[in-house]
Amino acid sequence: MMDSLRTAANSLVLKIIFGIIIVSFILTGVSGYLIGGGNNYAAKVNDQEISRGQFENAFNSERNRMQQQLGDQYSELAANEGYMKTLRQQVLNRLIDEALLDQYARELKLGISDEQVKQAIFATPAFQVDGKFDNSRYNGILNQMGMTADQYAQALRNQLTTQQLINGVAGTDFMLKGETDELAALVAQQRVVREATIDVNALAAKQPVTEQEIASYYEQNKNNFMTPEQFRVSYIKLDAATMQQPVSDADIQSYYDQHQDQFTQPQRTRYSIIQTKTEDEAKAVLDELNKGGDFAALAKEKSADIISARNGGDMGWLEDATIPDELKNAGLKEKGQLSGVIKSSVGFLIVRLDDIQPAKVKSLDEVRDDIAAKVKHEKALDAYYALQQKVSDAASNDTESLAGAEQAAGVKATQTGWFSKDNLPEELNFKPVADAIFNGGLVGENGAPGINSDIITVDGDRAFVLRISEHKPEAVKPLADVQEQVKALVQHNKAEQQAKVDAEKLLVDLKAGKGAEAMQAAGLKFGEPKTLSRSGRDPISQAAFALPLPAKDKPSYGMATDMQGNVVLLALDEVKQGSMPEDQKKAMVQGITQNNAQIVFEALMSNLRKEAKIKIGDALEQQ
């Protein structure tokens, strides 16, 4: 590697820092460059292996991301074996695509400079506080991992190179100015139309309907006249929030005594370092310090640790678990105390102890309110779980009624009115409860009451036990109950057909120049002109922009059906060429070029996959 990367590789701070950053790269598969393939690979892409470790890390990261995003809904997806299998395949496909892109980037000899790698490190959000690089946060996080600087720098370089390839592909599409102006004029075009509406509802009222037509329509469309499955439910609800228990001073003191670790802030230590490549350089720096030299100034001038040097050698506050062994073993006890020259894996160090914050246990008064809330909640949960078990046992022992469960709970069961899947009572509107009601397991035969449910828990602190007291299966409504509804539908259908036939005849006359007489005879006339834009998504706008351009002093005619189902005759009088502000034109071009770039990129990936030798590991093929 070039000198600046070797400098990074020999930085104590970077030795600490590089390990943790790779966690973020696992999300995009970059860790594949760091984990050895071995024979037990997840996939082999040409000669590059994607290890099982890389695949499992990527899959777990994606799963964790989804869990954070979806919350409680994720558990339902996780229980779906087919969905999780598909998710695993998607993650593997992504890793394969990234390997193909990496190989193609190397084939094109794309590269990233050392300075770009360094700037990417400084810009990593994980190491920033309030948008700025923070040395203390940097050290605290990165001492927890064991990845070398060389490994991380190469992984980051590979990721940036792949992104360079993607950006190159995405930036190849463009539009000429003439094309842009022509397209903008077309997109911004407006059309001036007049409308004449045939009111289908008015026609429907005039349509004669026979009993035979009503019966025939009913028979052919019975599924449209269903009464949904209906239920009446009796239930008992248990809620930990209603079971608050008193909390005594003794309870609070006991919790405080038993959980001291929760109220203890561990000791923190602050060090500054100067790192050199050779022992002679370190001795020279130590000599200057002993003569009164300014530590911060010397660190900025002479330290090889590129991160701490920017802060005058300051490494920020460190807890014991994050302090490197070199600093622990320096034996510094007093503030301002300097070490001698320390040999380390990254060169030579001079360390100064800047400050110590001793471990501190918060007083009982400081945490009393928090403890009281915790103890109260724990007592409520204990009472809730005890009552839940008692009610569950009672409901199981007497499955023919909720009487025993009522006695155990100390409350009477609540009885709902009739409801269906579409209007579940709000009090019962939880997925586990709905599943129990609607899965059929609690329904008795021929509408009779069924058995009691098991205890159904919701959100960990609420529970229900219920039984279906009455049930009505889904059924077709009798014709007598829906006759008027069926008649209206038949009339409306006949009116729609008549309106379209009438409109077609009028359209022929309009195009033949006989429209005035025909429209007058039909009791119709065109309304005032209105201007429509191409962006309109309604049926009238869509039909207007599908019409041929009008001739001079002669409208272009057409017909459409509006949002209410009425048939509308259209007269297109004028086409106005549009204009577009430059910012809108720029946004339009950007959208088109991005879409085209996506198409090109997908074609590239398809071709890379087609030409590659891809083998899925045996273990994954069997899953």
Curated annotation (Swiss-Prot):
It is a single-pass type II membrane protein. Keywords: Cell inner membrane, Cell membrane, Chaperone, Membrane, Stress response, Transmembrane, Transmembrane helix. Residues 37-623 are periplasmic. Residues 266-355 form the PpiC domain. PANTHER family: PEPTIDYL-PROLYL CIS-TRANS ISOMERASE D, PERIPLASMIC CHAPERONE PPID. Interacts with the SecYEG translocon. Binds to the lateral gate of SecY. Forms a complex with YfgM. Also interacts with YidC. Interacts with peptide substrates and misfolded proteins. Has been isolated as a homodimer and homotrimer from inner membrane preparations. This is Periplasmic chaperone PpiD.
